[in-house]
From Swiss-Prot:
Domain notes: The Gly-rich region is probably involved in binding calcium, which is required for target cell-binding or cytolytic activity.
UniProt repeat feature Hemolysin-type calcium-binding, residue ranges: 744-761, 762-779, 780-797, 798-815, 826-843, 844-861
GO molecular function: calcium ion binding; channel activity; toxin activity
Organism in which the protein naturally occurs: Actinobacillus pleuropneumoniae
Protein's UniProt keywords contain Transmembrane helix: yes
Localization per Swiss-Prot or TrEMBL: Secreted; Host cell membrane
InterPro entries: Hemolysin-typ_Ca-bd_CS, Hemolysn_Ca-bd, RTX_C, RTX_pore_form, RTX_toxin/Mannuronan_C5-epim, RTX_toxin_determinant-A, Serralysin-like_metalloprot_C
Topological category with respect to the lipid bilayer: Multi-pass membrane protein
Protein name as annotated: RTX-III toxin determinant A from serotype 8
NCBIfam families for the chain: RTX_toxin
Keywords: Calcium, Cytolysis, Host cell membrane, Host membrane, Lipoprotein, Membrane, Palmitate, Repeat, Secreted, Toxin, Transmembrane, Transmembrane helix, Virulence
Signal peptide interval: none
Ranges that cross the membrane: 248-265, 275-334, 372-418
Phylogenetic placement of the source organism: Bacteria, Pseudomonadati, Pseudomonadota, Gammaproteobacteria, Pasteurellales
Amino acid sequence: MSTWSSMLADLKKRAEEAKRQAKKGYDVTKNGLQYGVSQAKLQALAAGKAVQKYGNKLVLVIPKEYDGSVGNGFFDLVKAAEELGIQVKYVNRNELEVAHKSLGTADQFLGLTERGLTLFAPQLDQFLQKHSKISNVVGSSTGDAVSKLAKSQTIISGIQSVLGTVLAGINLNEAIISGGSELELAEAGVSLASELVSNIAKGTTTIDAFTTQIQNFGKLVENAKGLGGVGRQLQNISGSALSKTGLGLDIISSLLSGVTASFALANKNASTSTKVAAGFELSNQVIGGITKAVSSYILAQRLAAGLSTTGPAAALIASSISLAISPLAFLRVADNFNRSKEIGEFAERFKKLGYDGDKLLSEFYHEAGTIDASITTISTALSAIAAGTAAASAGALVGAPITLLVTGITGLISGILEFSKQPMLDHVASKIGNKIDEWEKKYGKNYFENGYDARHKAFLEDSFSLLSSFNKQYETERAVLITQQRWDEYIGELAGITGKGDKLSSGKAYVDYFQEGKLLEKKPDDFSKVVFDPTKGEIDISNSQTSTLLKFVTPLLTPGTESRERTQTGKYEYITKLVVKGKDKWVVNGVKDKGAVYDYTNLIQHAHISSSVARGEEYREVRLVSHLGNGNDKVFLAAGSAEIHAGEGHDVVYYDKTDTGLLVIDGTKATEQGRYSVTRELSGATKILREVIKNQKSAVGKREETLEYRDYELTQSGNSNLKAHDELHSVEEIIGSNQRDEFKGSKFRDIFHGADGDDLLNGNDGDDILYGDKGNDELRGDNGNDQLYGGEGNDKLLGGNGNNYLSGGDGNDELQVLGNGFNVLRGGKGDDKLYGSSGSDLLDGGEGNDYLEGGDGSDFYVYRSTSGNHTIYDQGKSSDLDKLYLSDFSFDRLLVEKVDDNLVLRSNESSHNNGVLTIKDWFKEGNKYNHKIEQIVDKNGRKLTAENLGTYFKNAPKADNLLNYATKEDQNESNLSSLKTELSKIITNAGNFGVAKQGNTGINTAALNNEVNKIISSANTFATSQLGGSGMGTLPSTNVNSMMLGNLARAA
């Protein structure tokens, strides 16, 4: 006979034997259940329809003659049952006694009758009298003030809940009538529920023993595949972590005592094969020292009945148990303790600063971890039992009833655990809340505000180096620093857990004073009238007697008041809604008589209102109104609308410190100097500081708290039409944003800085000073004596009519002037194009390959060894007297030659392609222009005239040393003197430097002199001297320039 045939025969034999055993067990069970029922058979059959109707409901049965006045809240129990929808049935005592006798429920308050699941009122009443502690355990979440009725509801609904778990899927009405395994299961579940409730009530503190069990569990799990990390974390749970001295451990220990007692293995003599078949041996190997068993009744009657113990079956059991254990559940347990430890360490610092809220939060997570560890460990053990049993009975004919039975009982216990967890966690949270109430009653202060105070003290300690440096950074004697302590997650979490979110604010603002690198502990005398009221939006530092910085160190929430209300939105859900009554502006009164700096860049001026597809993001704007004093002030603006009244002095407004949007600065309608309207586009990629409403969620078991609060974020506005509008009064100088800005000057003097971005600056009328700064900018001076500085980038500078000073800076720039004035054109680095006008111009190409065109008038060109390949094209008149100054060349180092119609000069040390100066069309005849440079002067003052060169090239048109064409005067002082006169006349007139006064420009004279010095010293002849004078007023005279020329010539 083949192996396969043998296996089939053996399987058939085993199946027949199992069938006989099952029938035998069924007959015994049926006979046992029918015992005592025969006397009530007619009543049971007559109640068949009632059973179908009420078989899955819980009924509170009360004898009609029972005296509830002697019980413990008996009438409260009746009322609670009615409120919960549980049927209350009054019956004759004889009828009740028959039911008790027939179904074996005489000594229990919970049982089965033909009515279904039944709570027997007298037994329940007596039980509550005997075990009053059960009311405290199950009802601890309700607090001391809750009525007896509510406690009774909690007790009955709890029993109802756990019964629903264990009896799910069981058709009780059929089970009661027909008997069989389902009825046995139901009876066992009800019996165990009664036993557990009783044991929980009588529980004692066994928490220390449980600590050891968790640690042993961790050691065993560490060796299990894939669970090593979990095991190591569980071993870190020390005995102190589960100390019975903590909050709420009286409840936890009672629960553990009852559950572990229910799992005591009564049949210690059960065979090893029986344990293996049931899955207990393997589950013990994985779970460790936590006892997992069921009653001897279940073990003897079900699990030992013919279950396979072969190797494949054992492997199936092992794998099923492994899947039943949830590593994530134990990681959550360990995370609770780790979070408690983490917050506890964090709390130590703030406890020293006067706030112990973090310690309370740590205690909560410590106790929540204890509760979670208890319930998770036991639930995992239950899962292992159920999984092992199901796997072991997979091939048995009696497997389905066994699996159903064990699953039902483990589900019942899990239901009790889950029902008990929420009251325990709420009990812990309530104790913490009481501590907060006691503190507030003692100190008369908001507990959570005290937490913000402690956070701010820590901020001052941590940021002292930065905060104390602001005086020096902003060049003021004193700093008034405003800091917003924003929403704190730990403080918010504590408020949520304790249900006190309505007593919490979104943060708190603080004012601190720094002087000479020190924090002033008390408000200085001259700040006696400092006002900072974030609820009204008022700031006043007008009484300051020193130069002062007003700075918002961190983003400041919009002004206004907050209110909160906590409401319940579900069975376990609560939300604390925030209502903000905001102000529409900040009003700042600045220092009266001293210069000050106002850094508003962290002022939040947009509060988010709503979002829609059609309109995008919508905001409530808070306008800034700032009244400055009579000193020289600096104002750094934020992204919202502003109204600046600068007062006397030279005042500067900055838009470049933060993202302030695309600017259009318009002074064309100004009737007085310093008045501008500014429009700012805040759409597109512009990022703004906006105030938003956020929420923080915290959980206490099933209870979830949502707290709304104000916070801020730096983000794109999300509104294509969002704009800001500024009005500037008495502002002398404006620095643009880092985007593409447009400046429209007034008819008065304007001082504009483009900052970053490709900007358009138009000075219009007036003697303007325009700075392109970074980017490819276009600067137009228009009418007036203007100063134009291109800065970095490829810029276009148009001086217009008047005496203008143009400096291209780095990049490939184009410089052009109009009219017949005196102009200075400096190319700087890069390949530049310089176009003079009909007047007398100074053209200095600087480094790079430049093109210089002087136009009409007597122009002055500069060339040096670092200039690169330059081309000069002078289209002047025959009466012009143009000059070329070779700043660091002597004639004996230069070669000159005629190339086509051009005169070419280059150093005899350079190649043909580098360091070449070409004077275009020098030799061209027959047109109306004079393309010659009338005089060429070297660094020694030796002079070469156009006539000399013309005569020589007629006779010997070849390359030769330029010295051969020069006049014989060596280092002729008179030649240098004529250069001094030319330069002095151009420089002192260009850009109106010569009449610059403090009241008109506000530009530091030393800075202007530095710019002039750059022009002069670019010719090496002038490099060893500086313009004299450091005060304001008229710049140095021609004699100073003469001295420079003479000294440098002699030095050469």
